[in-house]
Swiss-Prot record:
HAMAP family: Acetate_kinase. This is Acetate kinase 2. The record marks 179, 240 as: Transition state stabilizer. The lineage of its organism: Bacteria, Pseudomonadati, Pseudomonadota, Gammaproteobacteria, Vibrionales. The keyword Nucleotide-binding applies. The active site is at 147 (proton donor/acceptor). The gene is ackA2. It is an enzyme of class 2 (transferase).
Length: 397
């Protein structure tokens, strides 16, 4: 076999992202998105050799299956089908059961579905994607890569909530953390860049996108992370509140708010969108700020302050720091946000490398600041979760 390509699938409730990844280089040969599933305007689009194509999905229902069937046709027409060795699925929640990538069988699929209580928006959709891919590619091995798996090395003191232990035993209420595949990838890439064995490297990984989280990594392992039982905890995000006094929920419900309205507000109408009253997009926030928009300025300040607070607190579980790693759409591209976060860390001695910070954008890695006090750097590493999913799938063949 000349190539080892993996079809990587990230299945949402009304969408499906896919890419064919070369498991040796990480190159995406083709990538695409099916969206608006369950609606008349359902479409699938893909990008191949710089050209984008879009098609309507005309079927009345089962849009995940129709999208994956179209992907099969694409693979065959482009000549990739014979080089596909596996299908890798991004699954959001693995609970305590899954600590690493696993080959999917009926038992694993049932376990993923049983964890739907912990991730009601994500795991049922992931299971639908698996079932559709198994029907479309019956002879290909399928693997599940879990967002939570990397964080299963957290010590009890980091993942235990300060509530009745019975709630943990009965319902599994604890910190799980997410973005694990991204934090795993960038920490390995940072260790390579710094020419340091990952087993001896310690990082604070800062994944900033529409969802955002910070992870403390000691000797290559996750020891704490900002997201919690759900991806709602931790940092302020595009539309999510992040950490919040839980008493606010009771307060709003006493004011007549329904449970659904409270959590829709916290998940979809908070964060950048809620504070600015304008947009959930960091680029829109920066643009409005330049035009004197007070809400945008406040959103920028709250966001960068909270990220810096988490970074500072994550020095606690580490015995040394090699680097702060910025990744994710905002972390990789937003120079003003990185600059403000590092400015908030003045006591840690980080001095910006202005040329380095300017250069480390749009897919380029680089060192953007140094601290002589900590003998550490701040750096940008573009994430590549699909590459990890492809690699870890191939490793289990």
């Amino acid at each position: 076999m000349s190539n080892s390509y993996v079809l990587v699938i990230n299945s949402g409730s009304s969408s499906l992202k896919f890419a064919v990844i070369d498991s040796q280089t990480g190159e995406a040969l083709i990538s695409g998105l099916g969206e608006c599933f369950g609606m008349p305007e359902a479409v699938i689009s893909w990008k191949y050799q710089g050209e984008k194509t879009e098609e309507a999905i005309t079927a009345a229902d089962h849009h995940h299956q129709h999208a994956i069937n179209r992907i099969v046709g694409l693979m065959e027409s482009l000549g990739f089908a014979q080089d596909l060795v596996a299908v890798g699925h991004r699954i959001v929640h693995g609970g305590e059961k899954f600590t690493s990538t696993v080959r999917i069988d009926e038992e694993v699929l049932a376990e993923i579905e049983s964890l739907s209580d912990l991730a009601p928006l994500h795991n049922p959709a992931g299971a639908i994607g698996i079932q559709a891919a198994m029907a479309a590619f019956p002879s290909l091995p399928q693997f599940a890569v879990f967002d939570t798996a990397f964080h299963q090395t957290m010590p009890k003191k980091a993942f235990t909530g300060a509530i009745s232990h019975e709630l943990y035993k009965q319902y599994g209420i604890r910190r799980y953390g997410f973005h694990g595949t991204s934090h795993y990838y960038v920490s390995r890439e940072a260790a390579k860049m710094l020419n340091k064995p990952i087993e001896q490297a310690s990082f604070i990984s800062v994944h900033l996108g529409n969802g955002a989280s910070v992870c403390a990594i000691s000797n290559g392992q996750s020891v704490d992370t900002s997201m919690g039982f759900t991806p709602l905890a931790g940092l302020m995000m595009g539309t999510r509140s992040g950490d919040l006094d839980p008493g606010i929920i009771e307060f709003l419900m006493k004011k007549g708010w329904s449970q659904e309205k409270v959590f829709e507000t916290l998940n979809k109408k908070s964060g950048f969108l809620g504070v600015s009253g304008l947009t959930s997009d960091a680029r829109g926030i920066l643009e409005a700020m330049e035009n004197g928009h007070e809400g945008a300025k406040l959103a920028f300040e709250v966001f960068t302050y909270r990220v810096a607070k988490y970074i500072g607190s994550y020095l606690i579980p580490l015995d040394h720091l090699d680097a702060i790693i910025f990744t994710g759409g905002i972390g990789e591209n937003s120079l003003p946000i990185r600059r403000e976060i590092l400015g908030n860390l003045k006591l840690l001695g980080f001095v910006e490398d202005e040329k380095g910070n300017e250069a480390a954008r749009f897919g380029k890695a680089g060192i953007i600041a140094k601290s002589e006090l900590l003998n550490a750097v701040a750096m940008v590493i573009p994430t590549n979760e699909e590459f990890v999913i492809a690699q870890q799938s191939v490793e289990l063949l």
